Amino acid sequence: MTNIRKTHPLLKIINSSFVDLPAPSSLSSWWNFGSLLGVCLAVQILTGLFLAMHYTSDTATAFNSVTHICRDVNYGWVLRYLHANGASMFFICLYLHVGRGLYYGSYMYSETWNIGILLLFAVMATAFMGYVLPWGQMSFWGATVITNLLSAIPYIGTDLVQWIWGGFSVDKATLTRFFAFHFLFPFIVAALVMVHLLFLHETGSNNPTGIPSDSDMIPFHPYYTIKDILGFLIMLTALSALVLFSPDLLGDPDNYMPANPLNTPPHIKPEWYFLFAYAILRSIPNKLGGVLALVLSILVLAIVPMLHTSKQRSMMFRPLSQCLFWFLVAILLTLTWIGGQPVEYPYVIIGQMASVLYFLTILVFMPLVSIMENHLLKW
């Protein structure tokens, strides 16, 4: 008799995705981050659901409701810090996942890659709206500054900003709608993840060599299930350590002050995972130019497949491209540092140079070096 997992209408979908799925035999630990992102999303949805049971999305009580969760709700502080630091883990895994895709040429699966970019935008929007909810100083001023950027859109900008605010400033209406969207978006992200996996399973996984591995496949279970579980344990241990030992390490102290529209914080900055994009935004003195650069800093990933000039897919056997890739990582770390610094000399000029180099590396240097490598290999 055929096993039920291969015949049952629901079980056979799970079976073909997680059990009998043929997977390349050479996948390294860099392929663990997809499943880790799934765990992060599950943790965020679960902790978020329980937090929403105690949170009130009203300007008069939002800050106090978060304090109430931390002080009076059973293990409320664990929920709150798991959710806040879980977002940081989410973005660490996201950036490593995207970096893996760039390094090993996984972007050649264009549908999977483009859905991934859409997912990145959706997660960033969700995280931004979540940061507004505790209604601290940085929540309020962050929301004011970032939503105000839309006013740079010609003709409709000002009306659009007021429409999003639900008034003439960030206020009760803004907080209520941000809570509604912050609750809704993770489920949209979960649906997009399904589409992402659907397109991935149409082609099968890439592998570190970038060479088709159809002749050398192994079943996903037990080989990669056990490997993924080890990844889960390592990540959850790191998250637990962060939550239990230094829960405020990645947060902003200003957010422990209730929102005050009459008092601007000395340095308005987003959470650490947006600092690189914030640095690119600030490096252009023109408002519209800055907004365009901000969007393009992520959207540039969409044209990476078109700029692939190498005869090889992966960077595994391309030392010059590897050097450029790690140069790009160094630029992103520099931008992250600059985004958290005040707008003064020498930070401004460093940010501008790093921003120019970021776009130049992706759009010019990488395709040129790939062509050079082709010639060196006489291809």
From Swiss-Prot:
- Annotated PROSITE patterns: CYTB_CTER, CYTB_NTER
Q: List residues binding heme b b562.
A: 83, 182
KW Metal-binding (keyword) present = yes
GO cellular component entries: mitochondrial inner membrane; respiratory chain complex III
Where are the membrane-spanning stretches?
Answer: 33-53, 77-98, 113-133, 178-198, 226-246, 288-308, 320-340, 347-367
Q: Which coenzyme or cofactor does it need?
A: heme b
- Positions binding a ubiquinone in this chain are 201
Subunit-level organization: The cytochrome bc1 complex contains 11 subunits: 3 respiratory subunits (MT-CYB, CYC1 and UQCRFS1), 2 core proteins (UQCRC1 and UQCRC2) and 6 low-molecular weight proteins (UQCRH/QCR6, UQCRB/QCR7, UQCRQ/QCR8, UQCR10/QCR9, UQCR11/QCR10 and a cleavage product of UQCRFS1). This cytochrome bc1 complex then forms a dimer.
Task performed by this protein = Component of the ubiquinol-cytochrome c reductase complex (complex III or cytochrome b-c1 complex) that is part of the mitochondrial respiratory chain. The b-c1 complex mediates electron transfer from ubiquinol to cytochrome c. Contributes to the generation of a proton gradient across the mitochondrial membrane that is then used for ATP synthesis.
Q: What else is known?
A: Heme 1 (or BL or b562) is low-potential and absorbs at about 562 nm, and heme 2 (or BH or b566) is high-potential and absorbs at about 566 nm.
Q: What is this protein called?
A: Cytochrome b
Q: Which gene carries the instructions for this protein?
A: MT-CYB
